[in-house]
């Protein structure tokens, strides 16, 4: 078992690095921020420090938030392992979509490697996914998840590496079909969002994906799968419509145009509103869950 996690090194101080540093510092972890801009940082979380070179004292957990590039992240890993060759430093990547198997190829100790997937805004979003690297043990995942939970987060533990973690895979599976329906003229973006907001998402809020099918009846669901799944859009490539929109600079709220017209809308105001409304919804769901009947235990079905 790895040593207890008390000292955390945050490598990179962009939006995500800042938010995650705040969560660890606020929870009482000794938090050091490694950034080339260390001397100019003025917004450090209380109790944290910033350095422009790796500190002499080895951290227990080092979390990198470098750009989403395999080579860049691997260079950070090498730098950390070279600085602390005789210490059992756990290295975590903050990637949301890169392959942990590929990232781990540069590591001397891949058995100490995990993925941590935070959701924006990372300091207030309640959930973090903790995923095993290709050589990491169940115990290591649980060990890191326990430290993350100490910062006030709920954790989803994934014991095998999988590109995209859990939530992104589910989200992209739904979105890939949604973009296909828009691209082929079956439904508009507004129609899809209306259906999601009025029924699909509320059902998920209350019963998730899988339990809802138990409630509805797996026999009905299995019958529907036989006719619907073969008709779903499976082409294995990113949606061309979406890629073309981004190439034209139509990236959504930030540029004023995406699937919706955001002309005249203030980016910070809109994002703050979305975060505020999500927080209010989560508070409501927490209250609802406290009053609800205990959930039935999930069965541990053997993997195929």
Q: What is each PLM-predicted segment?
A:
Residues 2-6, 10-13, 19-22, 27-31, ...:
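NAD(P)-dependent Rossmann-like dehydrogenase/reductase catalytic/cofactor-binding core
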Residues 36, 44-90:
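Rossmann-like NAD(P)-binding element
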Residues 41, 80, 103-104:
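Hydrophobic packing residues within well-ordered alpha-helices of enzyme cores
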Residues 63-64, 93-94, 172:
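Redox-cofactor binding/interface segments in oxidoreductases and associated redox assembly factors
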Residues 122-131, 151, 156-186, 194-208, ...:
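Active-site-proximal catalytic alpha-helix in oxidoreductases
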């Amino acid at each position: 078992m790895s040593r207890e996690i008390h000292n955390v090194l945050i490598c990179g101080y962009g939006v995500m690095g800042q938010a995650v540093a705040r969560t660890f510092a606020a929870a009482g972890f000794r938090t050091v921020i490694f950034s080339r801009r260390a001397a100019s940082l003025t917004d450090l979380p209380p109790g944290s420090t910033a350095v422009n070179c790796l500190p002499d004292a080895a951290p227990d957990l080092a979390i990198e938030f470098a750009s989403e590039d395999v080579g860049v992240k691997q260079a950070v890993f090498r730098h950390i392992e070279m600085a602390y060759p005789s210490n059992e430093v756990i290295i975590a990547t903050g990637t949301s979509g890169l392959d942990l198997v590929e990232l781990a190829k540069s590591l001397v100790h891949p058995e100490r490697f995990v993925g941590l997937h935070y959701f924006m805004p990372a300091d207030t979003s309640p959930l973090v996914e903790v995923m095993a690297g290709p050589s990491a043990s169940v115990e290591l995942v649980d060990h890191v998840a326990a430290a993350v939970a100490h910062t006030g987060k709920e954790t989803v533990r994934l014991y095998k590496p999988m590109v995209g973690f859990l939530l992104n895979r589910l989200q992209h599976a739904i979105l890939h079909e949604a973009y296909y329906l828009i691209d082929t003229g079956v439904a508009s973006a507004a129609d899809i969002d209306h259906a999601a907001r009025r029924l699909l998402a509320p059902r998920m809020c209350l019963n998730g994906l899988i339990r809802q099918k138990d409630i509805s009846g797996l026999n009905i669901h299995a019958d529907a799968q036989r006719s619907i799944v073969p008709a779903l859009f499976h082409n294995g490539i990113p949606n061309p419509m979406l890629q073309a929109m981004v190439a034209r600079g139509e990236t959504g709220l930030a540029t004023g145009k995406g699937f919706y017209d955001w002309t005249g809308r203030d980016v910070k105001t809109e994002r703050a509103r979305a975060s505020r409304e999500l927080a209010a919804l989560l508070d409501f769901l927490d209250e609802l869950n406290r009053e609800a009947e205990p959930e039935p235990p999930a069965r541990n079905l053997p993997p195929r």
